[in-house]
């Protein structure tokens, strides 16, 4: 990841805690890969978390990881998550998380609730008929990961979390809409973004990189040969926001101040 800078000293900037950042990455927007000993790893078709942050993973019933659970209550596994910026940029990976724990199949009595939870983030047709069978076998199932340890690494730094700290946090309120907001800013307001930055930042192209309730990350670069590499700048909001109404209000203030 490019180096990160802020428009204030890091000590005075409010931002999400490591646990909140981990919960945001695990929410299900970022892609995940499931890794277990002796099992070929593969991308997870869809995943999300329940209210306590427990990952719920949709997999084919004949997938190697599902076969590894045959006759077992659970198996050790790690969910690896890579957070990629929705705006097309070089070096788009914004952060990573690793959730280590014990993987098991969701009991039949809890399968419907888990499918509904998954459908909020991923409205896939497979979730409508999880009980459907072909040749006497279920085609899809949902697995749950009980986290024993969580690691997160991003522009804020790296941290290792206990499961209680992770479960007590909440994902960012804009996790489900961030991609749409950033792509809109990039397509409709890219020319205005440089005016949001302080004069200390060298002039050059600016693209939206990240959004959370405390502020934005902007990807900055200067025309060559002045800056051979890009760098990221944190633009903090005056106060945290919790909904789209508050976000629109903050944006109006930012762009009003930036208008020449």
Where are these regions (language model features)?
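Conserved hydrophobic/aromatic beta-strand scaffold that supports enzyme active sites
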Residues: 31-33, 98-100, 142-144
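A generic structural signal for beta-strand entry/edge sites
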Residues: 52-58, 76, 140-142, 213-215
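Catalytic micro-motifs at enzyme active sites that drive phosphoryl/nucleotidyl and oxygen chemistry
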Residues: 21, 42-46, 65-67, 84-90, ...
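C-terminal edge-of-domain segments
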Residues: 1-4, 114-260
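A general structural signal for short secondary-structure junctions and capping/turn motifs
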Residues: 24-26, 69-71, 89-90, 133-137, ...
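Short beta-strand micro-motifs enriched in acidic
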Residues: 49-50, 106, 221
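An N-terminal domain-cap segment
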Residues: 2-70
């Amino acid at each position: 990841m490019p180096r990160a800078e802020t428009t204030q000293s890091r000590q005075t900037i409010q931002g999400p805690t490591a646990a909140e950042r981990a919960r945001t990455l695990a929410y299900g927007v970022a892609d995940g890969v499931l890794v277990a000993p002796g099992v070929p790893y593969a991308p997870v078709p869809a995943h999300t978390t329940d209210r306590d942050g427990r990952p719920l993973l949709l997999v084919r019933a004949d997938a190697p990881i599902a076969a590894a659970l045959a006759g077992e209550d659970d198996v050790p596994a790690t969910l690896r998550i890579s957070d990629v910026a929705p705006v097309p940029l070089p070096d788009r990976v914004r952060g990573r998380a690793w959730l280590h724990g014990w993987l098991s199949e969701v009991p039949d009595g809890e399968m419907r609730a888990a499918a509904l939870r998954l459908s909020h983030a991923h409205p896939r047709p497979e979730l409508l008929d999880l009980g459907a069978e072909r040749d006497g076998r279920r085609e899809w199932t949902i697995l749950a990961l009980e986290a024993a340890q969580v690691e997160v690494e991003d522009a804020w730094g790296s941290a290792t979390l206990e499961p209680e700290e992770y479960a007590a946090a909440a994902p960012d309120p804009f996790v489900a809409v961030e991609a749409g907001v950033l792509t809109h800013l990039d397509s409709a307001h890219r020319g205005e973004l440089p005016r949001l930055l302080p004069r200390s930042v060298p002039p050059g192209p600016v693209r939206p990189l990240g959004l959370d309730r405390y502020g934005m990350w902007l990807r900055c670069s200067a025309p060559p040969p002045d800056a051979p590499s890009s760098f990221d700048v944190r633009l903090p909001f005056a106060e945290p926001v919790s909904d789209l109404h508050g976000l629109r209000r903050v944006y109006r203030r930012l762009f009003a101040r930036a208008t020449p």
